[in-house]
UniProtKB/Swiss-Prot annotation:
Component of a complex at least composed of URM1, CTU2/NCS2 and CTU1/ATPBD3. May form a heterodimer with CTU2/NCS2. Plays a central role in 2-thiolation of mcm(5)S(2)U at tRNA wobble positions of tRNA(Lys), tRNA(Glu) and tRNA(Gln). Directly binds tRNAs and probably acts by catalyzing adenylation of tRNAs, an intermediate required for 2-thiolation. It is unclear whether it acts as a sulfurtransferase that transfers sulfur from thiocarboxylated URM1 onto the uridine of tRNAs at wobble position. It comes from the Eukaryota. Pathway: tRNA modification; 5-methoxycarbonylmethyl-2-thiouridine-tRNA biosynthesis. Its EC number is 2.7.7.-. SUPFAM superfamilies: Adenine nucleotide alpha hydrolases-like (SSF52402). The gene is Ctu1. This is Cytoplasmic tRNA 2-thiolation protein 1.
């Protein structure tokens, strides 16, 4: 049976049938329709006003490559200026090749490119160093948890560096649907409320962010790259298999097989989601350390870096460890963290006996935990794992060993198990 004629131009043989509409289109007409839909998304959502300086998050992958190409085609009509911003996470054997793809794209399309590195922004930390630090620590957070938070912060810093007024990322409809599923499964009402919004800021980000490909399926993104002959980096990150997103992706595939419109249905549902007043998160404040938008005392980036710089996992009980010193941000210093050794704790002033039969109960510590200094653990910092260590006055909301949000240590305290 011969291929049908293109539904749009009625001249050329159709090369595909669009999953969304069922229309048979040739490659040229499909690309034109794809670009028109992205233009409609931007204009209808008032995402990029004329005169905007747009930082395009460029990873070298298919989504950011297609986004940069489409916006370059639409830039004269939108009246915007584009600047590619790439993030070097410090993943050996993976990121170097991806950055080469980004450099090639920037040269081919004559777009300015700025690369910002975790190592420069975050006190020497790279993702490989984070992976080594957290390996075997018993933490529930995957490398992708750290990378997602730090990458958003790095992209924000890169955008500020180039004088951007807006940030765009290449999240497609499948990415958005996976995020909606993840937030439902986690019961994260705050992120559910933000998840379907085309333009938003989010924690740690003051510049407006938007996702022009939010309604474009992953299949159509790949098809656009194919028909436009776009070259991109297609290898998966070495840390991706451990991410929780993979479970949401598998579930989404099952849903899509039973209901082809499931992806867009989830995206539109998130857009229309209305939370009860009691479930709505409070308006964001500012991070006490770096000044970024934050829903707690510390923004997510500073809190994660705080935990990393405390030296977990510890090599042995009682060994020295590096910790984060709580200092106000210094003008002109691009690093978010500084590390220094902490002085040993003072003599124990805890009034309760410290032995296995009658362990220290200051704050509800586990049997066997020994308090070696006065410490107020009233919000629940008594569920610490063996080896969790509070080292100075700070908010432990991110959980040094599983602490609840709001737990604040007011003095040095070692919660290691009692030695034999």
């Amino acid at each position: 049976m011969p291929a049908p004629t293109c539904f749009s131009c009625h001249k050329t043989r159709a090369a595909l049938r669009r999953p969304r509409s069922g229309q048979a289109l040739c490659g040229s007409c499909f690309c034109a329709a794809f670009e028109a839909e992205v233009l409609h998304t931007v204009l209808a959502g008032h995402l990029l006003p004329p005169g905007a300086v747009v930082a395009v998050g460029a990873s070298g992958g298919k989504d950011s490559t297609v986004l940069a190409h489409v916006l370059r085609e639409l830039a004269p009509r939108l009246g915007i200026t584009l600047h590619l911003v790439a993030v070097d996470e410090g993943i050996g054997g993976y990121r170097d090749a991806a950055l080469e793809a980004v450099r090639s794209q920037a040269a081919r399309w004559e777009l300015p490119l700025t690369i910002v590195a975790y190592e420069d922004l975050f006190g020497g930390w790279t993702m490989d160093a984070v992976a080594r630090s957290t390996a075997g620590s018993g933490r529930s957070r995957s490398c992708c948890t750290f990378c997602g938070v730090l990458r958003r912060r790095a992209l924000e810093e890169g955008a500020r560096l180039v004088g951007a007024t807006h940030i765009v990322t290449g999240h497609n409809a499948d990415d958005m649907a996976e995020t909606v599923l993840m937030n439902f499964l986690r019961g994260d009402a705050g992120r559910l409320a933000r998840g379907g919004v085309l333009g938003s800021t989010g924690e740690g980000c003051a510049l407006p962010r938007c996702r022009p490909l939010q309604f474009a399926s992953q299949k159509e993104v790949v098809l656009y790259a194919h028909f436009r002959h776009l070259r991109y980096f297609s290898e998966e990150c070495v840390y991706a298999p451990e991410a929780f997103r993979g479970h949401a992706r598998d579930l989404l595939k099952l849903l899509e097989a039973a209901r082809p419109s499931a992806v867009l249905d989830l995206v539109h549902s998130a857009e229309r989601l209305a939370l009860a007043p009691a479930a709505k998160p409070p308006p964001p404040g500012t991070c006490s350390r770096c000044g970024a938008l934050a829903s707690h005392k510390l923004c997510q980036a500073c809190a994660l870096l705080d935990g990393l710089n405390r030296g977990l996992p510890r090599l042995a009980i009682g060994k020295g460890r590096r910790v984060l010193q709580v200092e106000p941000p210094q003008p002109g210093n691009p690093s978010l963290v500084t590390s220094d050794p902490v002085a040993p704790a003072g003599p124990c002033t805890c009034k309760q006996p410290k032995d296995k039969a009658n362990p220290c109960g200051n704050g509800g510590d586990r049997a066997g935990a020994t308090c070696v200094s006065q410490c107020d653990l009233s919000p629940g910092n008594g569920e610490d794992r063996a080896g969790a260590t509070c080292v100075s006055q700070r908010d432990l909301s991110l959980g040094n060993g599983g602490d609840r949000a709001g737990a604040t240590c007011v003095s040095q305290c070692d919660l290691s198990p009692v030695a034999e």
